[in-house]
Amino acid sequence: MSLGVTTVTRASVGLRSERGPVLGAVMLSTALIALDSTIIATAVPAVVDDLGGFSQFPWLFSVYLLTQAVTVPVYGKLADVYGREPVLLFGIAVFVTASLFCGLAWSMPALIVGRALQGIGAGAVQAIGMTVIGDIYTVEERAKVQGYLASVWGVSSVLGPTLGGVFSDYLSWRWIFLVNLPLGAVALVVLYRRFSERVERREHRLDVAGAVLLSVGCSLLILGLLEGGSAWAWTSGVSVAVLVTAVALLTAFTVVERRAAEPVLPLWVLRRRILLTGNVAALALGALLVGLSSYLPTWAQSVLGASALEAGFALAALTLGWPIAASQAGRLYLRIGFRNTALIGVVLAVLGTTGTALLGLHAQLWQVAASMFVTGIGLGLSSSPLIVAVQSVVGWNRRGVVTATNMFARSIGSAVGAAVFGAIANTTLAGRFASPPAGLEGDVPTDVDGTTAALSQGGAVAEYARESLHAASHGVFIATAVTAVVIAVAVAAMPRHTERLRFDDEHSTDEAAAPGPGPAGETAGRAPEPGSADGHRPPPS
């Protein structure tokens, strides 16, 4: 079989272009894994009624996030060694198979195992999907395409709970997972038939020790952050043991990576300024999103008295602003550069999250929606330039690791954010319940788990619980605003001009990613290089 070469031109961008089927398949698979991170939230009551295991249901969320996060760096390295196609196809196949297992689950432990397998498949899709886009489109083309992909991720993540409620109310909670089968199969077939790449075959020394240390260490770190303060106290022996072991394993990992011939996560991704600042921004972005999506709907319902649908619409304003801004981000960063475009976006995100933090007990839903819309505009403007910036400074043989590291940082940020915001909310609630006003002693719940019951009592107890929940949510919203400021600082620290990074082991045959006109940092219209993806599968010869 001879492999054809497609010259990349701006005219061939879009779903109807030659590379359109590949773009559509990547967008579809990305939407599925993003939906599955949140879609089960509103179906939990139906799942528990059917399978039991109420005390175990939090693992449906934790285990998916955990296995997805820890596999991302490994997949990134494998994609740089063996190519994107086999890794991405493997990930989609595992995700679809695991979805079938989840749909047929006979018990809560079985469903948890299925969710773990889903996360293993999702890790490949999350990292390699973005990498494929970086391979088959130039920077100018990615101005539009990455906006599509960022919008798909953001919108799918936030709409997940709404779709989960529809499935569980009108069909069955099992269809939350079974619907992935035909859609995932379409993505799998399209990628197999239409996506090809040329990978230089040579002998590799896989960094097995590094992969094991990174996976186990990060698993324990995320586990400790997610379960600390809920499954066990932060100061308990279990919590200390888990976190100390995680730190020890990750320290050993850095030692191994310094000596590895082909490290699974090269330490230069933490030393190069453009990559370090991009990863810090991604980490903070992951925390910001989990804070808003987790606490804003609950606050709107319990404090403002909104219905579940109204609260969902308020949060959906973020998903409305995100794609609108993302569709224009590319045009903007081609004119003023990655850094400046992202900086404008994060300033808007700071304004939006600050507006949310300023909302009081008697805020109107339109005010909530307005602040979310501004935040969505800001995130839409900043997310695409950040990922394109880090991809554009390395060649094909390093783009998988760079992209995976950025996605990994966002996943770690989600776990850290969930832990920190949860600690803020729980500490505030516990403090207020421990010292109620005169006349309410004995009526106010003694622990945080009694918040829902207190809200349903009515009278002074319910009002105090409402005020307490507002205080807890207010603390979280302030923390999200601070997180947005962290993103702004990271973006401001990015280099003003994006240039190709140089490495000692590069040769003249490496990918030519010379800086292009203006701040974009790459020339449009070049043909794919050796070890690159054409974005289509040529006919058999």
Question: Which sequence ranges carry the predicted segments?
Answer:
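Helix-loop interface residues and adjacent transmembrane-helix termini in multi-pass membrane transporters
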Residues: 51, 81, 105, 136-139, ...
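Flexible interhelical linker loops that connect adjacent transmembrane helices
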Residues: 12-16, 140, 186-215, 230-231, ...
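Transmembrane-helix bundle of Major Facilitator Superfamily
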Residues: 2-193, 329-330, 336, 344-350, ...
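12-transmembrane solute porter fold
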Residues: 19-42, 55-63, 85, 151, ...
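Specific aromatic-rich, kink-prone transmembrane helix
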Residues: 130, 190, 216-224
